[in-house]
Amino acid sequence: MLILVPSILIAIGDPVPLPTSVEDFLQPGTQPDDMIQMLDPLSSSNTCQACHGDYLQESFHEPWDGWVGNLMAQSARDPIWHAALTIANQDATDSGEYCIRCHAPVGWYRGHSLPSDGSALEDGFFENDFDGVNCQICHRAVSPVAVPGDPVEDDAVRAALEFPPGDGYGNGRLILDPVDSRRGPYSDIPNAPGMNLHSPTPAIHSPFHQRS
């Protein structure tokens, strides 16, 4: 439609998005294809609540409560983000896939980021794409850069990557352990046989998890 204004000709219509594709937004780090080889799937936060929540009367002291009310837990449910996702796709074709990588990483790693409008994301009890940045995403993360004191398991995970992130590890360029070996900041974790209820493998002390 054309609107005539003195000395101005204004064209009004649907905006035309930039002709981009998923490849234009490719970032290094662990890829969805790598997840196919994952020995252990990314569990939802529901599997964590049984032990890490609902055991104290003052629940704000519990790890579960500290996560469930923060922005990480809501990153894939936030209506403002969903509105921004729509705008991103209107501006550049399939650019929303890049947004999903950070805001709904479980869904992204499970291969549910296309269509890039988030319509393929699934809400399940054991695997929930709407979990946001959940417990598994953080506690299975591997330091992208080797530093003194790194657990020995990290070297093998980094070496197996097809697209290592190098020194620039922002923008969702996470590296995830394909095995459910949880990492954390504490060095006094009981690791006797049968003590790790998450996995047959021991929990891992990770200096990477001592800084945010």
Regions found by a protein language model. Give the residues of each.
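Short beta-strand-alpha-helix junction that forms the catalytic/metal-binding core
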Residues: 134-135
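Sequence context of c-type cytochrome heme-c attachment sites
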Residues: 12-45, 49-131, 140-211
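Sec-dependent, cleavable N-terminal signal peptides
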Residues: 1-15
